[in-house]
Amino acid sequence: MLSIFVTFLGAFLTLIVMRPLANWIGLVDKPNYRKRHQGTIPLIGGASLFVGNLCYYLMEWDQLRLPYLYLFSIFVLLAIGILDDRFDISPFLRAGIQAILAILMIDLGNIYLDHLGQILGPFQLTLGSIGLIITVFATIAIINAFNMIDGIDGLLGGLSCVSFAAIGILMYRDGQMDMAHWSFALIVSILPYLMLNLGIPFGPKYKVFMGDAGSTLIGFTIIWILLLSTQGKGHPMNPVTALWIIAIPLIDMVAIIYRRVRKGKSPFRPDRLHVHHLMVRAGLTSRQAFLLITFVSAVCATIGILGEVYYVNEWAMFVGFFILFFLYVYSITHAWRITRWVRRMKRRAKRLKKA
């Protein structure tokens, strides 16, 4: 319990201490055509998460796997993320650094995708040497999935907490207490940021954003834990379950990249076509969109947990995930129809209230 308290305190104090420093060095987010917030907001959520995570590691050092490699990796991501938040680094440079860290994870930590489980039938789909290449691309993909989903207040924090909670539950169920406690500690380290990001309890005056530094750190940590828990002998979680745990960020990223490429745009060019933007455009408030998307993510994670608990065939879980994926893509590509339907339902609800 002491390590959990120190984790929360370290993360919270970092937000307080770094706030004036961020304003002084220009580490702030300014409103533009994509960002509709009021005023400049400090981009210090990543530093807070790093310090909170570091506090937990220092207190539980002997219980955690490959601490030097993990802490080095997230420190590099934090530094590059802060530079990107301040100066806008090329996405190709960021992807290159992420690839190098993935290679170090494979080479020094022996952490990589060796198999995909029984997603195609009653046999294990082993990847062999191609799994090393897939691991690099998967690492870059997951990092950027959580980076891209960070578009409205609370969303990145909420979805991250859902993923870490699901992982923690499955690790606890399997008796992997070190991984379970770390997963729950990660939630604790996110909470101070999430509270201030949502204006709890100090109001919008003390709002902070996660920034690329934080979102990339979260994405790397999730792929790190998922690889540790889905690969190797006696793995406590099936690979297909990982898809359900990170379903919303992963599917949203793939759907958005597909839509951008289809329109002849760069897949790296930011826009306002993510699911949270479409929900706000349909008439929901940003808080309502945050709660709805987080709820859907929790439902997806629960499906993954239940699949593990009741030993549902992995191929059936994989088919279910693909159905979810195509429903999501259909909704994104037909967003104008859904937007019109939501607005019509809201008008009817208002008329019924008046009546």
From Swiss-Prot:
Coiled coil residues, start to end: none
InterPro entries: ECA_WecA-rel, Glycosyl_transferase_4, PNAcMuramoyl-5peptid_Trfase_CS
Pfam families in UniProt: Glycos_transf_4 (PF00953)
Keyword Transmembrane in annotation: yes
GO MF, any single term: manganese ion binding
Main location: membrane
Leading EC class: transferase
Membrane topology: Multi-pass membrane protein
The family this protein is said to belong to: Belongs to the glycosyltransferase 4 family. WecA subfamily.
Function recorded in the entry: Catalyzes the transfer of the GlcNAc-1-phosphate moiety from UDP-GlcNAc onto the carrier lipid undecaprenyl phosphate (C55-P), yielding GlcNAc-pyrophosphoryl-undecaprenyl (GlcNAc-PP-C55).
Name the UniProt record assigns to this protein: Undecaprenyl-phosphate alpha-N-acetylglucosaminyl 1-phosphate transferase
